[in-house]
Amino acid sequence: MALFSVPTPVTTILLDIEGTTTPITFVKDVLFPYIKENIKKYLLEHWQEKECQEDITQLQKQAEKDSHIDGFVPIPSAISDNETENMIQAVVDNVYWQMSLDRKTTALKQLQGHMWRSAYITGQLKGEVYEDVVPSIRQWRELGFKLYIYSSGSVEAQKLLFGFSIEGNLLKLLDGHFDTTVGHKVESKSYRNIADSIRCSPENILFLTDVVKDMPLYLVTQESYPEAVIRGVCC
């Protein structure tokens, strides 16, 4: 992480995950491939469970919203047990399609989070973090800063990554988590929602991310809102 001085008004640090606390390669080369390689097996094993069916329902609703998009993959409803296999394949195809477009819909992230949970609990996955992350977080906590995570990955997926990390359980070092349910990272309203949720003035929040395009225009033009620090580059 680039060396920088935390602005005086800041009391809260908001951390992105991919490319900020965790190598992009972990997400691209470990987490995403795990989904593609195991989704059909997971659906077959958990199909009758309430949680899995809720995930499917959310994916179907998202598919309906996506019907206007070129190349979208529909997810039909299974009328009989004989059609279950076809429906499972439709879900697999839809997930593949969304992932090929690097989409970050809440429905997709929810299913992915549940799949990763199973893998973390069984020891198939360990969350990766950069070697400077834990020392930095500990230092910030000692200085009295509040620390939150804001990522496009679901809150559950975030907690799994930090709860089952290569550095052990890091959840005790964090004060909370936010995902796309508060809005997307490119939307200024999302940051106001977070500020309201933690009862903190926006000017007291520092957002750390590695992706400039994730910062709404006001983050880099308005001094009264959170600033941003890019891994490797201070701005």
From Swiss-Prot:
Q: Which cofactor does it need?
A: Mg(2+)
Kindly state which reaction or reactions the protein catalyses: 5-methylsulfanyl-2,3-dioxopentyl phosphate + H2O = 1,2-dihydroxy-5-(methylsulfanyl)pent-1-en-3-one + phosphate
User: What is any one of the record's Gene Ontology cellular component terms?
Assistant: cytoplasm
EC number assigned by the record: 3.1.3.77
Assign the protein's first listed, main location to one coarse class. Answer: cytoplasm
Q: Which Gene3D superfamilies match?
A: 1.10.720.60, HAD superfamily/HAD-like
Enumerate the GO terms in the molecular function aspect. acireductone synthase activity; magnesium ion binding
Chain residues that bind substrate: 151-152, 185
Q: How is the cofactor bound?
A: Binds 1 Mg(2+) ion per subunit.
- Compartments in which it is found: Cytoplasm; Nucleus
Task: List, in alphabetical order, the GO biological process terms annotated in this UniProt record.
Answer: L-methionine salvage from methylthioadenosine
Pathway(s) the chain acts in: Amino-acid biosynthesis; L-methionine biosynthesis via salvage pathway; L-methionine from S-methyl-5-thio-alpha-D-ribose 1-phosphate: step 3/6; Amino-acid biosynthesis; L-methionine biosynthesis via salvage pathway; L-methionine from S-methyl-5-thio-alpha-D-ribose 1-phosphate: step 4/6
The organism's superkingdom is given as Eukaryota
Q: Which InterPro entries match?
A: Enolase-ppase_E1 (IPR023943), ENOPH1_eukaryotes (IPR027511), HAD-like_sf (IPR036412), HAD_sf (IPR023214)
Q: Which CDD domains match?
A: HAD_EP (cd01629)
Give the UniProt keywords, A-Z: Amino-acid biosynthesis, Cytoplasm, Hydrolase, Magnesium, Metal-binding, Methionine biosynthesis, Nucleus
Positions with a binding annotation for Mg(2+): 16, 18, 210
Assembly, per entry: Monomer.
Q: Indicate the family of this protein.
A: Belongs to the HAD-like hydrolase superfamily. MasA/MtnC family.
User: What job does the chain carry out?
Assistant: Bifunctional enzyme that catalyzes the enolization of 2,3-diketo-5-methylthiopentyl-1-phosphate (DK-MTP-1-P) into the intermediate 2-hydroxy-3-keto-5-methylthiopentenyl-1-phosphate (HK-MTPenyl-1-P), which is then dephosphorylated to form the acireductone 1,2-dihydroxy-3-keto-5-methylthiopentene (DHK-MTPene).
Protein name as it appears in the record:
Enolase-phosphatase E1
The opening ranks of the lineage are: Eukaryota, Metazoa, Chordata, Craniata, Vertebrata
